[in-house]
Each structure stands twice: as C-alpha cells, then as structure tokens.
Amino acid sequence: MVSIRLPDGSVRQYEHPVTVAEVAASIGPGLAKAALGGKLDGELVDTSAVIDRDASLAIVTDKDADGLDIIRHSTAHLLAYAVKELYPDAQVTIGPVIDNGFYYDFSYNRPFTPEDLEKIEKRMQELVKKDEPVTRRVVSRDEAAGYFRSIGEKYKAEIIESIPQSDEIKLYSHGGFTDLCRGPHVPSTGKLKVFKLMKVAGAYWRGDSKNEQLQRIYGTAWTRKEDQDQYLHMLEEAEKRDHRKLGKQLDLFHMQEESPGMVFWHPKGWALWQQVEQYMRRRVNEAGYLEIKTPMIMDRSLWEASGHWQNYRENMFTTESEKRDYAIKPMNCPGHVQVFKHGLRSYRDLPLRYAEFGSCHRNEASGALHGLMRVRGFVQDDAHIFCTEDQFISESIAFNTLAMSVYKDFGFDHIDIKLSLRPEQRAGTDETWDRAEQGLRDALTACGLTWEELPGEGAFYGPKIEYHIKDALGRSWQCGTLQLDMVLPERLGAEYVADDSSRRRPVMLHRAIVGSMERFLGILIEHHAGAMPAWLAPFQAVVLNIAESQAEYAQSLAQSLQKQGVRVTADLRNEKISYKIREHTLEKVPYLLVVGDKERDAQTVAVRARGGVDLGVMPVEAFVERLQEDLRSFK
C-alpha cells in the first residue's frame, strides 16, 4: 500500500506503486491533462516517475512557476532537436533555463543567421504538432558515453565524464532525438506551444576563453501567448531605454576599446554622477558616518592577510615595483580595517561608521562587460560599521531605514529583500550564526519589512541581506547589501578595549546602498528612460530666445538662475524656436524657458515642462519656487 499526501492535506492510497501521471488521473481528467510534472517530497520529477513509497506529492501544471521552468527546459531540448534535424553536423552541448527563457549552445562550422533562426523556429513548431511523447531512461555511464561518441557528440561524452560517479545518468528522448539531462521534462512535445527564438551570441565551451567558441541560441517560452507578447513588448521598451543608447543620445558618457570596462564621463553625465554622489554623501553624513579615503594600490601582504590574494587573485589587477607585488583594490574593506586599527579603540568609540566613495577595479572577463552595468573600474558607496555584538541589531535597523528612504527618493518603490543564511562550509559556531541570523531578522521585522530567506546562500564569513530594486519595466536589480563579517576583523587584527579592559573583536558590517555607482546610474537612466527628475537632471532648465533681440535678457536670466543654484544653460543660437524646442525636448530637459519680446519687457518667462506641457507665462520667481518644490519632493 502506497499513501500519497496531497497539498490540501488529503491522503490517497494505492495498492501498488503508481506514477505521478496516474495519481493526477485518479484525481481528475482535467488535472491529468494539465500535469507537466510533480513535486515529490519537494523534488521536481517527471509525470512518468514511479512512486513506490509513502510520500507527499504536488502535481505541477503550467499555473506553477515550476511548471514554467519545465516548459522552458523542454523547449531548449526541442530547439536542439530541431537544429539536429536541419543541421545534422551541428554538435549539441548544454541547454539550461535562464530568466524568462532558455538557451542552447551548439558547435557548428558556420555562424547561424537570422534566416536560420526562422527555419529552426518553424521546425520546432512542426515538431510540437507531432506531439511526440518524451521518455526517460536511466543508463550506465559507459552506455551513455558510448552512445554519444557513436553519434559524434563529443561534448556530451565529455560532460558525462565529469558527472560524479554517484549521480544517475538520465537520457531523454522524443522522436529521433536523445539528450543527456537531469530533467524533468514535459510528457510530450505538444505541451510546448508558446515560444520564440530571440538571438544568437558567442559562448565559450565551459565558459573558458581557452576553449572552443560555440554559438548560443537564446529563446523564450511561456504558458500563454499573452504573457509572451507582454514580455516581448517589455523587451522593445527596454531597447528604447538602453542606457548605452541613451548615454550616446544624451551625451552622458562613452566607452572605448583602449580602456575596456572603464567609463569616459562627459560633462552632462558627470553632472548626473555628482548629483547622486552629493545626495549620498549628505545622507550618510546625516546618519553619523565618517567619510574616509584609502589607497587604491596596496601591498600583496595585506591582500594575503585578508584572504583576497588566495581566493580572488584572478579578478585583481596586480603590478610590481621595486621587487614588491601590489594589487589595485577590488574592494574597500581591508583598507577600512586599517583605519580602524590605527590607534587604540575603546568600546566607548563604537559604533564607528566609515564611509568611502571608493574607486575599485576588478578584472572582469571581456565577454561579461556590458555598458555601465558590468565594468572593470567602478566606485562604490561603500561603508563599514564597526560595533559591539550588542549594537549590531540597532545598526542594522538604522541601515534598513536609510536604504529604504534612499531608494524611495530615487523613484524605486518596490524593493524585494532576501536574507542569505549559513552555508555548509562556514566560519564560526552554530550559536554565533544563530545570533547573527536572528539579529538580521529582528532588524528587518523592526522596520516592518518582509523578506525571502535563502538557506545556504550566505558567505562563509556571515549572513547577509540583499536589497533588490524593481525598475519601471519590472526588472529586478540587486543593489544594496548588508553583510555581517565574522572573519575579516580577526584576519586583520582589528580589536577594541571592552568595558572590562579585555581585548575583543568588533562586529563588522559591510554595507552599500546603491553598490556600484556606474551600475546604479545605468539603472537610473533606464528606469527614467533618460528623463531624469529635475533634482538629478544634468540641466534642470534651458533658456531659449525667440529672436536676437531677446538674447541679452535670455543670457542674464540664465546667469540669475545659476546664482540661485539652478543648473541651467542658455541656447542663443540663431535658429527657429521650434527647432530649438524640439532639440532640447529630445535631450529630455525638465523645463524649457522661452523668452520673446513680451517676456523680456515684463521680466517674465514662458515655461514648458517636459512632455510638451505648457505651464504658461509666469514671473521668474514663480518658476524658481516651482522648481524648488520639485527638488523638495524629489521630482
């Protein structure tokens, strides 16, 4: 007798082992038809999986997130099936699920073209109509490797050799195609109805630039066409908002081959940067942080003591001088510990909060670089809090409050918070981890925040909180971090004198709100589609004269506004006013101030807000007050 507990708490009993599909059928024909897989004691399995013991089971359908993952994984295999039918000489490698879709890497003797993608997608649709059953079988390592070698699939054979001996080798087949996979997969290809191939890109075998370059075909798959259409529309909008395109259009920055992963900031872009940095500086100063500056290049011995030389050297830029090895800092924390150590610290000095807009460099792979979002040289709004164990909860509460306020001011209202908990390999005792994890929970609760817990995702030296902001397109970006560190203070010898005159290690909190300034500016540009709110905009206003006779008034008006702190410029070119308005509208300036003879004579200004909104003629003082109200409300 096999007892199956269902999600509603009911128990069904069967006289013999049953498959997931049979359980679904016993519940109802609708569920049997909708079943894509099952969650057996928490593990995703195929509908063909046999249950021969008492267990809990949830039937997975296309209404579940797991169901969508199964669909996407199966569509990746369908893609490989279609490619092999159309291009038999192509070799298949791997095809995982990714955010919003999947990809599959192929080795082929020529580049795939857009026309090839159309043919492949059409063939996939034909295979779906066949509704071929997907079958799974477990085979020996030798049998699997021998099979793939016999059909010339050397990459699959290599993958099999790298699979741990204890793992099962599963082969999935539909029609004339067989692939190596952990699964699970849909019961038949007819379940895969909504998909689209997106693009081809290059990729290295096993992600190593020393290996062969493969061709990666990206695709997306959904349960409903409406969802796919919405996603494709979002991609179109994202293309319009691409910060690289807007950076060029708005003359904010550029990047060039002579300095890969580094940014050349133009005057307007640097003005935007300065608004963000000055705002962040004001907020951390108000929160009791002390701003410091630490060296960019430090001796190898310090990086060895911190552990970075042993564990992070591949990502560090190094140099040598006078027979000494140095590294350009990839992060600021070791330098901050040096400042803390400089002089005897007492418990009365704590908490000490050190902030730095620290310039860091990391040797990212060239293929991973992406505009401002992934760079080699970047500045972090970094800070480290040194406190006692009794203070770390109150410090965490204060940081949560500060971070939420900052995100709101920048226009981000939806923040997802994730708490990463202890990994298997970790420093410190279970009791220490218990206190640390519960302390971070208590801090989040005190702020009225909700969070998702990620068991096993913490760093070996402590748990952390991540802050993921959602932009205008619903995309999630991890920006802020609050990381508790149980290791670095000890590694680098940080200590303070406690109230009983003993020497103790401080608790160290690594924290950032925006993270990489470059990346955050890229996110801001895309979130606002380049139309930065007035408090951030490089120019808040442009004064435009209609004719030469108003040029002097326009110039004096711009100078007067500048003295009042307005970021303003005057466009006195001898061009039609309609041309100038159109040009500055495309530059997304918040306010256009038009002056003609009437405005000059009355010492007023005609104000047009971004979006073509005519606010009419008003005294200059009224415009300044309106702008100041925008700034007060972060508009």
From Swiss-Prot:
Enzyme Commission numbers on file: 6.1.1.3
Keywords, alphabetical: Aminoacyl-tRNA synthetase, ATP-binding, Cytoplasm, Ligase, Metal-binding, Nucleotide-binding, Protein biosynthesis, RNA-binding, tRNA-binding, Zinc
Similarity section: Belongs to the class-II aminoacyl-tRNA synthetase family.
UniProt protein name: Threonine--tRNA ligase
Assembly and interaction partners: Homodimer.
InterPro entries: aa-tRNA-synt_IIb, aa-tRNA-synth_II, aa-tRNA-synth_II/BPL/LPL, Anticodon-bd, Anticodon-bd_dom_sf, Beta-grasp_dom_sf, TGS, TGS-like
Subcellular location: Cytoplasm
Cofactor dependence: Zn(2+)
NCBIfam families: thrS (TIGR00418)
Keyword Aminoacyl-tRNA synthetase annotated: yes
Pfam families referenced in this protein's UniProt entry, alphabetically: HGTP_anticodon, TGS, tRNA-synt_2b, tRNA_SAD
Enzyme class of the recorded protein, top EC level: ligase
GO cellular component: cytosol
Catalytic, as annotated region: 242-533
Catalysed reactions, as listed in the record: tRNA(Thr) + L-threonine + ATP = L-threonyl-tRNA(Thr) + AMP + diphosphate + H(+)
Cofactor note: Binds 1 zinc ion per subunit.
Binding annotation for Zn(2+): 333, 384, 510
GO MF annotation: an example: tRNA binding
Its biological purpose: Catalyzes the attachment of threonine to tRNA(Thr) in a two-step reaction: L-threonine is first activated by ATP to form Thr-AMP and then transferred to the acceptor end of tRNA(Thr). Also edits incorrectly charged L-seryl-tRNA(Thr).
Principal location class: cytoplasm
Source organism superkingdom: Bacteria
